[in-house]
Amino acid sequence: MLKIGCHLSASKGFKNMGEEAISIGGNTFQFFTRNPRGSKAKTIDETDIKEFLKLAEENNFSKILGHAPYTLNACSADENTRNFAVEIMKDDLERMEYIPNNLYNFHPGSHVKQGVEIGIKYISDMLNTVLKPEQTTTVLLETMAGKGTEIGRTFDELKEILNNVELSHKVGVCLDTCHVHDAGYDIVNNLDKVVEQFDKIIGLDKLCAIHLNDSMNPFGSHKDRHQKIGEGSIGLEGIKNIINHPMLCNLPFFLETPNELDGYAREIKLLKSIYQN
């Protein structure tokens, strides 16, 4: 069974997101844990949570994915920005425990000319501050395209962060297909090699989710502009190979390129039609 969903608005609660996911043929979804620009999160509605968990169990949902706000920059040169990232993630992870055993994704951040090593240290320090032994949520580092001074453009950078995290079993990776394509990993012509590289450097046991996005940009452009499935430089054949790869096919896939629900429904129907496992 293809584990597939898209990014949905959390404004009407978890049960509503679950119902929307089902209505478009999905069995999971991604959501922002708060406004993507980082304002205060909504109050937890425990009745809504309870109803969603029942709905998810009845409909055999895969793990859902909470996405941290874009403003979270754990490796900023500004100490206040780094402290803000710690507080946001700490609060988000406490809230994620209302929906236990799920996933929480964040962009590692930009080191802003401090250097990669300092950036990696700050990110690791944040994770060592916020992670708790008793948490059930797995925190995911997202692969990045390499715009500016972004950390996470290479598998080696992500591995170095993981190596410095004390509770490393609480941390994994979310692979964004647009980002790795734009970062210079040839998932179109040499997907097997890229998967082998990931396994050798990080380990496939750490790969927990995939952001399934096509790319507006040429290979290795370091641009990060998503395109709808089959309409970009990865192409439908490239996407088909990804969702059917034996080492990737059982992971949850999340569509992120902005779309209407009807558009996501069409993409999910298309993906199901080319899914062969």
Swiss-Prot record:
Role this protein plays: Endonuclease IV plays a role in DNA repair. It cleaves phosphodiester bonds at apurinic or apyrimidinic (AP) sites, generating a 3'-hydroxyl group and a 5'-terminal sugar phosphate.
GO BP field: base-excision repair
Residues given in the record as Zn(2+) 3 binding sites: H179, D224, H226
Protein name per its UniProtKB record: Probable endonuclease 4
EC number(s) stated in the UniProt entry for this protein: 3.1.21.2
Cofactor(s) annotated in UniProt: Zn(2+)
Family of the protein in this entry: Belongs to the AP endonuclease 2 family.
Keyword Ligase assigned: no
Top-rank lineage group of the source organism: Bacteria
